[in-house]
Amino acid sequence: ELEWLSFIPGIVKGIGMVINIFTQPGDKVIIQPPVYHPFRLTPQGNGREVVYNPLKENADGSYSMDFDNLAQVADDKCKVLILSNPHNPAGIVWDKATLARLADFCYDHHILVVSDEIHCDMALWGNKHLPFAMASEKAAQCSITFGAPSKTFNIAGIVSSYAIVPNDTLRQKFYSWLTANEFNEPTLFAPIATIAAFQQGEAW
């Protein structure tokens, strides 16, 4: 839905915004290493404790989510889980069953999932990206998704990212804050470049 969508001035900035809007100092943020280092630095820099739920390395060298460990490390202070979907740097295009299982856990434990999907247009070798919010109804109701054209189309300097928030309560709280602080207003070139990339950039 159109109203689910908003401009944001960068995904790492968006993560910082979510942390400050939806958590308090001393709350915990779950990450799944090995993962993009700002997932750790941004919560820590904002006075939140980082909880580690490392991926499991399988015998064939692939990785999978460790749900047993997640159940052990998550407690009532855990308010946010930052998901890399597809995963950077492991290169995993998460399947629906995995994402739905994660959604079940986070929804039932009142944990907000921030899904960084900046690499979604770069799934290769027949893999198909599934947005976290489309994995299940619970996923849609407990998540904020971030994306951008910058990685796929090499236009990071344009500074154009977006948020998608299906849940009414989460969206009202997040987007009201963005509006009040004028963080939802793109530069002149950001929407032009973004539309051009997605409509005409397939050959690239």
Feature map (PLM): residue ranges:
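Alpha-helix termination/capping residues and helix-transition junctions
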Residues: T23, D75, L112, E137-A140, ...
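Helix C-cap/helix->beta junction micro-motif
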Residues: N46, D108-H109, A139
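Short, Asp-centered acidic motifs that coordinate Mg2+ and/or phosphate
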Residues: V80, L112, I144
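Short aromatic-enriched loop/helix-cap "lid" or pocket-rim segments at secondary-structure transitions
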Residues: W125-K128, G157-V159
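PLP-dependent aminotransferase class I/II
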Residues: C142-W204
